[in-house]
Structures are given as structure tokens and as C-alpha cells.
Amino acid sequence: VRERGNDRRGATARTPLNRERVIRTAMAVADEKGAAALTMRAIAEPLGVEAMSLYHHVAGREEILDGMVDAVFGEIDLPPRDTDWKSAMRRRAFSARTVLRRHPWAIGLMDSRSQPGPATLRHHDALIGALRAAGFSVPMAAHAFSLIDSYLYGFVIQELSLPFSSSAQLEEVAGAILRDAPAGAYPHLTELATEHALKPGYDYADEFAFGLTLILDALHPDETAGPDRATPTPRPGRRSAGPGTGPAASSPQHHRAGRSAAG
């Protein structure tokens, strides 16, 4: 691997370049500048190498994106096995929200990859397994998985898009809107702002827990719970569950793969 410049010292002592460093550096670039800024040159620059050096460790940009998505899933806490299913789903959802806020580019990529890595598959399998062990049938587990993640992704997208990130900023933004609005034109919006959003202690992040609780309370296992529910047993004449089953079967990624196979 050729290092940039001729005046670097201690080159022999620097950390060797490998696939993990390439992936982590790409994530750092995306965290700062967004996924659109991810060129091989942009990734190579902070590593102090030429862009062509990256190809010794990754096949190209697509493999880097695959690795980034897998690393994100690897940062999310798996549903714990020593608690009830609602607590497990809640803990996993809060962990996922924290991780996705840390990597704002991730949501747009997470369901777009056709070659999921081991952390992604392990995450999905653990989530489905927790629901199955609690007594959710395969279809109901798929519905629950899809519903929870649709809410999770949507909330994070909205949260990251807000024009404020603190109470002071919210007061400034809302105050300007109310001042510029014609008197009495928007009574309900004014009421919500003055009687709720601008009250001391208000935090938009609290809305996440409220909505998640509503979703979890609306979901119910539809089969008998038990530890053996998490491990499917192949039936005679049928293939065991595998790719194409569970929540992933409802994702855009799955449908694109199915169309490709059919064509």
C-alpha cells in the first residue's frame, strides 16, 4: 500500500490498512458529509493512501456500502432473551434510534442492499426469534417487524429533518412562525405551540416512546408462546424457513430480488 507524500515519518509503525479500516473510515466520511460524498478518493484521503490502494481490500464502492450497512446493524442491541417481548422490542427500538441518529445516512441504505452481511442477518434472525418465542405466528411476526421498523425509520427521518435540535431553537423557530402569522388565522396550531410544544420540559424525542408504546400495545401474540417457537422445525415435503420468509419478504429489497430471479 503506497502512502501519500514522501515526508511522512514512522510509516512502518502506522496501522496496516484492512477491510475494517476502510469500512469504518467510509462511515466516518458519510457521518460528516453524507453518503453522496462517498467516493474512493474521499475514503482514501483520511487513510493517507491512494484510492487504488483500497481495491486490495474491497472490490469497490458497492462492497463498502454493504459493509457499512452491516456495521450499522452490528451496533444495534439485539433483543435481550431474559425479558418479555415488549421490553425486548422496546430496548432494541431505542438502541436502533440512537444508532440511526449517529449515522443519518444509514436509513436510505439499510433496505437497499442485496448482499446482507452476518450482522444484518443475525439482527433480523434475533428479532424474529424473539417474536416467535413470545407466540407470534410467522405472518404476525412479519407484520410486527414491518410495523415497528416503519415507525422507527419514519420517526428518525422526521427527527433528523427538524429545523431545531434544542428547546431554545424550537422556541426561536416557533416564535417566528407565530409572530409572522396573521392574528387568529391558525388557532389550533397556535394552541398546540403555546400550550404544549413551548412549555418548559417539552422534548420532541419523547414522542418516540409514546408512539412505540401504542404500537407495542396493539400487537398481540396469536400462538402459544414457548422457547421452541424460536427454532423452526422443517416439515416433511417442505423446505425450512430461509431467505424469502419473514419480514424481509415484505421489503423492497426482497421484491426486487424476486423480480430479478423471475426475469
Name each model-derived stretch.
Residues P182-L198, D203-L214:
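Non-DNA-binding regulatory cores of transcription-related proteins
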Residues G108-M110, F164, L189, G201:
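Short, hydrophobic secondary-structure boundary micro-motifs
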Residues V69-E75:
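Short, basic, alpha-helical segments at the C-terminal edge of helix-turn-helix-like DNA-binding modules
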Residues R21, T25, V29-E63, G67:
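Helix-turn-helix
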Residues V1-L17, P187-H196, P227-R239, P243, ...:
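N-terminal intrinsically disordered/low-complexity leader segments
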Residues H123-L147, Y151, F155-L178, H196, ...:
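Hydrophobic alpha-helical bundle segments that form small-molecule/ligand-binding pockets
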Residues R21, E63, R91, R122, ...:
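Amphipathic alpha-helical interaction segments
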Residues D77-R122, V138-A141:
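Hydrophobic alpha-helical connector segments
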